[in-house]
Amino acid sequence: MQKYCIYQHFQFQLLIQHLWIAANCDIADERFDATFHTNVLVNSSGHCQYLPPGIFKSSCYIDVRWFPFDVQHCKLKFGSWSYGGWSLDLQMQEADISGYIPNGEWDLVGIPGKRSERFYECCKEPYPDVTFTVTMRRRTLYYGLNLLIPCVLISALALLVFLLPADSGEKISLGITVLLSLTVFMLLVAEIMPATSDSVPLIAQYFASTMIIVGLSVVVTVIVLQYHHHDPDGGKMPKWTRVILLNWCAWFLRMKRPGEDKVRPACQHKQRRCSLASVEMSAVAPPPASNGNLLYIGFRGLDGVHCVPTPDSGVVCGRMACSPTHDEHLLHGGQPPEGDPDLAKILEEVRYIANRFRCQDESEAVCSEWKFAACVVDRLCLMAFSVFTIICTIGILMSAPNFVEAVSKDFA
């Protein structure tokens, strides 16, 4: 009696050449088939399992609008070119990412899939396809430490241009140095970014705005230096400039001119007596006995102060004990009552010296006015550029949709 073995389930392997496979349209490589052909596992029910390993390359659109806080979506579409849905039915399964190795530049967010059917004019049957969307988020730690943070620090250094004194001679040098540094970082960004004109990257917008701020700071610095080193012979400050800068802007910035808070001289009223400790002269001295020192001191003592003469002093607050009209008459061409030629010559010399000092005082006043205007412009630009820099930094960088997520995950 013979015994027969009945196998209810068995499987064997076949070469891929012995089986029919469908032509798919998921390849975007220079080679048409990027898979490695392995044997097909066939069981007794006719089920065939074919798992060829392969590297699939796909062409996808890269959106650099939010670089380096961008999220990219690449689609992998699997379908058949030769067989429709009546001959070949594609079913979608979830993508297995258990063997995914983390990357230092990208984070794999997910691979969602979607099955769709498409109808063509030539055929009545549908053509199914399965599309997997690979969603990746760029890790921003590298770009933040090497590009963003240095750019923020350099833009902060640009504000120091307005704090540097004009007499140092380094305001223009500092501004140009900061501008060149930003240009170097801009070139680094251009090397990293793909050559596309579809959109302006976020980091390029930030660098461009920072370079505009630094460039304007250099222009303003030139104006400030022109104000600070203004030639007094070039004319006085225009009225509108004086009103805007020295009055309105100075009041808004709480700035005061040098010497504005000084204590006023002691002799201000008619009834107050004034005397100079360094000048002691006798009122009984006759006019012919006067010398050049007396007249010089009488003119340059305290200019512009009018006081009532004291009975025991011939000099009051730096002026002679005579009326202002009499002083001006002597210093502006008037002849002394005695007609002494020596005294006339002395008065002529005193008149020249007085005019010289008066011109020097006027030149110093004009220079001081222009220098104060330069300080006001510096302070005003420091405030305005600081606010503009903060607004640009926060507004541009935080406009990225996943800015908070990127900072919390990459910089934590």
UniProtKB/Swiss-Prot annotation:
Gene3D superfamilies attached here?
Neurotransmitter-gated ion-channel ligand-binding domain, Neurotransmitter-gated ion-channel transmembrane domain
**InterPro entries with a match to the protein in the record:** Neur_chan_lig-bd, Neur_chan_lig-bd_sf, Neur_channel, Neuro-gated_channel_TM_sf, Neuro_actylchol_rec, Neurotrans-gated_channel_TM, Neurotransmitter_ion_chnl_CS
PROSITE patterns reported in the protein's UniProt record: NEUROTR_ION_CHANNEL
Instruction: Tell me what topology the record assigns in the membrane.
Output: Multi-pass membrane protein
State the superkingdom. Eukaryota
Pfam hit, one = Neur_chan_memb
Q: Which cysteines are joined by disulfide bonds?
A: none
Q: Name one GO biological process term.
A: regulation of membrane potential
Gene Ontology terms: cellular component: acetylcholine-gated channel complex; neuron projection; plasma membrane; postsynapse; synapse
Q: What is its main location?
A: membrane
Q: What are the entry keywords? A: Membrane, Transmembrane, Transmembrane helix
Q: Does the keyword Transmembrane helix apply?
A: yes
Tissues showing expression: Expressed in hippocampus.
Q: Which residues cross the membrane?
A: 144-164, 172-192, 205-225, 240-254, 380-400
Q: Does the keyword Transmembrane apply?
A: yes
Q: Which GO terms describe its molecular function?
A: acetylcholine-gated monoatomic cation-selective channel activity; transmembrane signaling receptor activity
CDD domains from the entry? LGIC_TM_cation
Q: Where in the cell is it found?
A: Membrane
- Entry similarity comment: Belongs to the ligand-gated ion channel (TC 1.A.9) family.
Matches recorded under PANTHER family:
NEUROTRANSMITTER GATED ION CHANNEL
Q: What is this protein called?
A: CHRNA7-FAM7A fusion protein
Q: Which organism is it from?
A: Homo sapiens (Human)
